[in-house]
């Protein structure tokens, strides 16, 4: 499944002659699990989304998971990452160690070994062409859903809701 599945490749590349990955419409995401982040102790905590200059447009997040464990991550449009000649892992490390809102919160925190993971998210934003339009997600007898249809929200990076709705419609 997903944006790179054989069916999506066939619909997008072969039938509609569009690029499978357009870096202006894909976000890179990177996350790690951390223990002991100040303000995220115990089983209660708020989801935090922060817009930091080094990852703009994009954001840095803290998602408390319970028992003091936190999903810490960063996401940014791939095209802009390439222009900055940087990697999300490096950007995240810099935010954690140097940003005034976070460096004190991570002083005693410990990253869970092997928890770092990166991925790409296909945005449902308009593509190039005579008329800006979403990525082609259909053909005779075929309707792509979820990531295969590039239905990730370009603002939030969330796609589960759109995937469920598209599956229901299909």
What are these regions (language model features)?
Residues 80-168:
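FAD/FMN-dependent oxidoreductases across multiple families
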Residues 12, 167-170:
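Generic helix-packing signal
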Residues 1-108:
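Predominantly flavin-linked oxidoreductase catalytic cores and closely associated redox partners
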